[in-house]
Amino acid sequence: MKNILKLLSLSILASLLFVVGCKKEEPVPVTTGTLKGTITDIISASALADVLVIVFDANTNSPTGASVYSGVDGVYSVELDPGAYFVKAAKQGYEKSPPPTVSPISFDVSLGVETVKDIEMFESTVTNGGWITGRVMAGDIAVAGALIVADNAGDGYSTISDEEGNYTIFNVPAATYAVNAWLAGYNSTEVSASVTASTETAGADIAMTEGASGSVTGAITFLATGNIEVDVALTHPSTGETIPGLSTITASSVYELTNVPDGMYLARASYNNDGIVMDPDWIIKNGEPFVTVSGGVIDRPFSVTNSIEVLTPSNVASSVEAVVVATTIPTFEWTPYSSTSDYVIEVTDANGKLIWGGFTARFASKNVVIPSGSTSVAFGDLSVGNPPVENLVSGKTYRWRVYASKNNNATGGWNLISVSEDQRGLFIVE
């Protein structure tokens, strides 16, 4: 009997062990989503390896982590908390994506979902470029999200420091540069970097100190338009990029930017696509709105007006994604602007180089003149003025703007009364 009970006990114990052993493990909860994409050459469609990718939180404009690089298949992948993000990509021999003066497009990453964001890049026009690397520190603390600019006589090349403070500036022409870091609340020491072609200039480490205390304030005057609240920012004069942390929205048509580092800036109002632009005649009369800060408070007012609406080719107002055109001779179209005597069109590349139209230095004269009865013109139309500086090139990104001019008794016999938005008219030639 004892043997039977013993066998029953062993059988029950074995059954319990079997049940416990077969119990499924609790699934690990999913806490992130995946951002993934393939980076390719925009012309050949071939995969690009070793592309530096920095992911930014769209709400704070700060990097989310260390830099990542694309693999030999051009693929990059990052695990992220659910939220809104944007990316910037750079590689030696290729232009940055997006270009420095174009705002990136944000997107959402959802829990447990793979978000695909492919990137196309075109070859750099810099033929003798090297690259600069370094780290940005404030004492023993890495400084993330600082704008790093290498400047030589007004020619600037830039990048953003990642979460570990590391940075790389690609495609820097051979020369000697002054390298600084820019971030609200911090002042930077300057380092020198001598660049040679196809070579890394390493160790350009930058020390920053907290305590930047300058302020820039001002009021917005609205001309020929109703009052709305607009964005105001301080940008780097060499690259046109907004200094991280130095942008705001007006309140009752007044703005204030605090914690401004010492240095010179180009102030900018109403850069967003909101139907409002800085008054071009105000800029001609007063000059570009530069401000030099060395602690203290600087007053910088602005005048703004209604913008001219561009039609085609152009990105939509809600996006800065350039549209693709299938010709190197596109026709530009816009809506008429009241009280205009004539229009001036201006076509620039992604780096701000004038390709066609625009004005001579300091708006002294117009390179093209389009009669007020016309609201379209083909690229390079010789009947309206000077020929293009160069032809449009397949695979490159361009921006076109149109100015409204009015005849009057002012010096030169005319003044500008409006212009199209900074972030409209973006297109890529197929």
Regions found by a protein language model. Give the residues of each.
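Long luminal/extracellular ectodomains of secretory-pathway precursor proteins
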Residues: V20-E430
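Sec-dependent bacterial lipoprotein signal peptides
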Residues: M1-V20
